[in-house]
Structure formats: C-alpha cells, structure tokens
From Swiss-Prot:
Record-level GO cellular component terms: extracellular region; extracellular space
InterPro entries on file: Elafin-like_sf, WAP_dom, WAP_four-disulfide_core
Keyword entries, A-Z: Antibiotic, Antimicrobial, Disulfide bond, Secreted, Signal
GO molecular function: serine-type endopeptidase inhibitor activity
Biological processes, Gene Ontology terms: defense response to bacterium; venom-mediated disruption of cell wall in another organism
Native source organism of the sequence: Philodryas olfersii
Cited function: Damages membranes of susceptible bacteria. Has no hemolytic activity. Not toxic to mice. Does not inhibit the proteinases elastase and cathepsin G.
Chief location: secreted
Source species, domain of life: Eukaryota
Name of one Pfam family that matches: WAP
Family: Belongs to the venom waprin family.
Protein name: Waprin-Phi3
SS bond list: 38-66, 49-70, 53-65, 59-74
Subcellular location: Secreted
Length: 80
C-alpha cells in the first residue's frame, strides 16, 4: 500500500474521532421551567426595558422569569 494512502486513512480516522467528541460535548440542555404561571402585570408606558433574567432558574427560589413589556423580570408564580 502506498504511504500517502496510509497517511490519508490515519488523518480521516483522527478527524472522525474529533468530530464525534465535539458533537457529544457541545450538546445544550435547556433548564426546566419552574411550576406556576407568570402573573399578569400592568406596566406604565415609561417602564424601563431591562432584562433581569432569561430562564426561570435565573430567579431565586420559586420565582419565575416573566415577560414585562419589552423586559423580563423575576416574579412569584401565580396559580396553575
């Protein structure tokens, strides 16, 4: 067998191992949603558009990350 073929096969083997490892280590797991629903919140027209959370688990305790206008904030959950 020619040396360049062996080199090519070895390179493909290494590359396939690296790709398989990259796929398994980079899987994202989204956090679970906390129980309850976001409360209905009335907001004033000049309410600031600040992002205080993205997921429920960004909030302390049992609070949920709820949309408030163009923002998201942590609130105690409402009833199911």
């Amino acid at each position: 067998m020619k040396p360049w073929i062996l080199l090519l096969l070895a390179g493909l083997l290494i590359l396939s191992t690296q790709l398989t490892t990259a796929k398994t280590t980079k899987q994202l797991r989204l956090p679970k949603v906390k129980p309850g629903e976001c409360p209905k919140v009335k907001i004033p027209p000049d309410y600031p558009c600040n992002q205080y959370c993205v997921w429920d688990f960004d909030c302390e305790g049992n609070k949920k990350c709820c949309p408030v206008g163009c923002a998201k904030e942590c609130f105690p959950p409402g009833p199911l």
